[in-house]
């Protein structure tokens, strides 16, 4: 019988407190055996057998059976080895072993999901607070706390995709693009390449850094993983639109609407918003209104601030103040602190000649969003226009403290100082603006303003170098080319002017919109696709019926195909133009995610105007009694299409955040 020192016996074994040990030892015999968890240095929990002491000395435990839970040899050696030395040193070794064991055991045990959720919530709160604080040091500390917490989440559960997305967004906000790219790559590998959120976030990063082809592949991977991921469809369409591919962007957004209609979610509203904004950009006001109206019909769309704000901006160009204010109020009802709504509404009130309303909106927007530089810049420009230069300087300084990397703020501040005759101060502001974010494409505005300043000051050579730097950053900047050519023409440099015009023509490219392009699908194409999706079981479901014009015919074809699946392959879909399109052809084209490969179903017999109307509008007009004079009337009292109807479908809110401004 060998005796083992007390401190050595309990090395590496988790025990209870002194009170619990005393109560346990008084009620248990010396031969009672209990099972404890002893941690290993390899972050693996193992079981060892130990005796609970009933006296000062205790018999050494018997050897652990290898038929039970496997135990590493290092742990067995630590538990069975006997040491010599003074008692204080041994107690110190035991204490250190228990502390190390506790931390290792915490990492080895299965982490509850609620603990990760709470940690993610704290990190999200820290990130939001960092974006809302004006103290630079506090902002850095909050970002550091959020990053540390998110990396802790990844250490606890490397397969949780939420931590990768949030941490990547945090890194992108700090312009740490390489780290974010590596993080997304690790996230895809650790989650089995099946999470669309990581793919979509990675694609947005590549699109932001100018890697268009790589972004396309990543967005394609996101929609392959999950066809109902509206975010990927929206970002992919925005990428194609930025490259001038309007048809491809429209097809992607419409395909996203068809796919995501089965899954009601708030992100679907951005697809309608993108189509409406593209129609408004191309001057098709009727189509834009149709998309905005269709998007706001659902509960998710009615709660989307982006739809209401874009609709209000569209109507602001049409000149009806009542409708514009109503739509802006609806936008603030969806998000009372939206910085975009406050800014757009304030600028519109300024154009309407209401400076007090404009200042009230800007003041409220800055109070709700203290770190948004665009609001400070707009407020400063309003004060400058009113002749309050000192107040404008204060607002510019506040905006720079809110976001020192905002190049638009540096440019506007420098232009104001140049207009006041402070040339040296303007040069200093332009230089600091270039230093703030030298890799940003927005530096073209700073270089252009600086070059115009040097041109007016008579420093022609310096102005040439600044204009050259501007076109190097953005070769498509028409304003920079025009200013440079105007300066050379003023100096009489005819040969240099011709050379600049040739260089501009070589570097310029414009978006070419196809002839007859429309964001509303042709009736024949909608009818064919509706029949296809109905036959596949995607027609009208519990989430809401299809809003296409050919929905009734599609439902009938779908019911017939559902009666016999074998007959579906031989169905011929009649096109309005008179041609025949077999069901298998449509199935192959749609499943290939390329609607642009479908033939043009638009014929001379198609009612193009009917396709531009919002779905269901004709039905509502037919159901309305003849004596009623409100259903088909627009704001001005006429019955023609193209005017926004009186927005009485949704009751006007009784209380608005800015009621005094109505």
Swiss-Prot record:
Task: State how it assembles.
Answer: Part of a 300 kDa complex that associates with RNA.
Q: What keywords are assigned to this protein?
A: Chloroplast, mRNA processing, Plastid, Repeat, TPR repeat, Transit peptide
Transit peptide: which range?
1-50
Q: Which GO terms describe its biological process?
A: mRNA processing
Q: What does this protein do?
A: Involved, directly or indirectly, in the processing of the chloroplast encoded psbB mRNA to its mature form, acting via the 5'-UTR of the psbB mRNA.
Q: Where is the composition biased (Basic and acidic residues)?
A: 88-101
Does Plastid show up as a keyword for this record? Answer: yes
Q: Where in the cell is it found?
A: Plastid, Chloroplast stroma
- Each TPR repeat occupies one of these ranges, namely 126-160, 161-194, 196-229, 231-263, 269-302, 305-338, 339-372, 373-406, 408-440, 444-477
| Location (main, coarse) | plastid
Q: Which GO terms describe its molecular function?
A: mRNA binding
Gene Ontology CC annotations of this record: chloroplast stroma
Q: Which organism is it from?
A: Chlamydomonas reinhardtii
Query: Where is composition skewed (Low complexity) in this entry?
Result: 23-32
Segments of this protein annotated with the region Disordered: 14-38, 75-101, 540-563, 598-662
Q: What is this protein called?
A: PsbB mRNA maturation factor Mbb1, chloroplastic
Q: Which InterPro entries match?
A: HAT, Mbb1-like, TPR-like_helical_dom_sf, TPR_rpt
Read off the PANTHER family from this record.
PROTEIN HIGH CHLOROPHYLL FLUORESCENT 107
